[in-house]
Curated annotation (Swiss-Prot):
Intrachain S-S bonds: none
The organism's place on the tree of life at top rank: Eukaryota
Gene Ontology MF, one: protein heterodimerization activity
InterPro entries in alphabetical order: TAF7 (IPR037817), TAFII55_prot_cons_reg (IPR006751)
Motif ([KR]-[STA]-K motif): 3-5
Keywords: Coiled coil, Nucleus, Phosphoprotein, Transcription, Transcription regulation, Ubl conjugation
Entry GO CC: cytoplasm; male germ cell nucleus; MLL1 complex; nucleus; transcription factor TFIID complex; transcription factor TFTC complex
Protein name: Transcription initiation factor TFIID subunit 7
Post-translational modification, as annotated: Phosphorylated by CIITA. Phosphorylation at Ser-256 by TAF1 in early G1 phase disrupts binding to TAF1.
Protein's organism: Mus musculus (Mouse)
Domain notes per entry: The [KR]-[STA]-K motif is specifically recognized by the SETD7 methyltransferase.
Phosphoserine: residues carrying this PTM: 171, 200-201, 213, 256
Subcellular compartments: Nucleus
Family: Belongs to the TAF7 family.
Gene: Taf7
């Protein structure tokens, strides 16, 4: 069976549940089941202008009625052969009729206020009066309080603000990739310098003491050699011996001074390379942390364009990490070569 495009779409019926006192409900049920022709004379419904109150007449007996909102939607089905069911409506309201109610309740006049928040709160309080806390069966008594939690408030952000924030983050990431920065704490630097001076002082004093003792030993050997040579060679000229002694002493002192200067230069070079290694380790750790945060961000983002952009930033961070690792390894090799000397 082909469907004609000109056919009007099927519309659901507008329905609600009518709840009556037991004696009146039995009268209406019998009239419906018997197929009474004049059902309109048996049952009539009249709603007031507010749309929430009305009058239900059963056998010309007026009952006060109130239209309430059910906790959830109930589907209404109908069947012809009791085998196939067709959905006819979604029922979300119920008209409750009572004998003791006021047929014409007083109309509440809303006080006009300039504050929109106050008006909104009053409307919300007014709607609460017509909220039905129970279901349509006995087991669902107080179902709204027992099973339904309060709706969580969500803070919605306008789409232009979101786009601006995304663009700002992307531009910040692009700038951060091409920027090299270093954090230096002045207090920590001073403490490190003081510790370095305190540590190097004993070493330098020990080196000088060792250097002085070495000079004394060398002088002692020279004097011993001279004394032995003077005993063996009594004919050597005294002036020549003194000149040779001064020359040898000067040579020894010059060699010791050169060695001391060379050691000081090596120590300064080692300290400089060690400082560069520490700085490079800090930069490498910072780059690795940024790469890790970028990977976490890529896992959370679902937009394909943003994911590609973040992936490009991550690739640049990986390349930067490789370069820093190479620089760190070269500095460590240079330091090892100096220490071996």
């Amino acid at each position: 069976m082909s469907k004609n495009k000109d056919d009007a779409p099927h519309e659901l019926e507008s329905q609600f549940i009518l709840r009556l006192p037991p004696e009146y409900a039995a009268t209406v049920r019998r009239a419906v089941q018997s197929g009474h022709v004049n059902l309109k004379d048996k049952l009539s419904i009249e709603l007031h202008p507010d749309g929430r109150h009305g009058i239900v007449r059963v056998d010309r007996v007026p009952l006060a009625a109130k239209l309430v909102d059910l906790p959830c939607v109930t589907e209404s089905l109908k069947t012809i052969d009791k085998k196939t069911f067709y959905k006819t409506a979604d029922i979300s309201q119920m008209l409750v009729a009572t004998v003791d109610g006021d047929l014409y309740p007083p109309v509440e006049e809303a006080a006009a206020t300039a504050d929109p928040k106050a008006n909104k709160k009053k409307d919300k309080d007014k709607e609460k009066k017509f909220v039905w806390n129970h279901g349509i069966t006995l087991p669902l008594k107080n179902v709204r309080k027992r099973r339904f939690r309060k709706t969580a408030k969500k803070k919605y952000i306008e789409s232009p603000d979101v786009e601006k924030e995304v663009k700002r983050l992307l531009s910040t990431d692009a700038e951060a990739v091409s920027t090299r920065w270093e954090i230096i704490a002045e207090d920590e630097t001073k403490e490190t310098e003081n510790q370095g001076l305190d540590i190097s002082s004993p070493g330098m004093s020990g080196h000088r003491q060792g250097h002085d003792s070495l000079e004394h030993d060398e002088l002692r050997e020279i004097f011993n050699d001279l004394s032995s040579s003077s005993e063996d060679e009594e004919d050597v000229n005294i002036l020549d011996t003194e000149e040779d002694l001064e020359r040898q002493l000067q040579d020894k002192l010059n060699e010791s001074d050169e060695q001391h200067q060379e050691n000081e230069g090596t120590n300064q070079l080692v300290m400089g390379i060690q400082k560069q290694i520490d700085n490079m380790k800090g930069k490498l750790q910072e780059t690795q942390d940024r790469a890790k945060r970028q990977e976490d961000l890529i896992m959370k983002v679902e937009n394909l364009a943003l994911k590609n952009r973040f992936q490009a930033v991550l690739d640049e961070l990986k390349q930067k990490e490789d370069r820093e690792k190479e620089q760190l390894s070269s500095l460590q090799e240079e330091l090892e070569s100096l220490l071996e000397k």
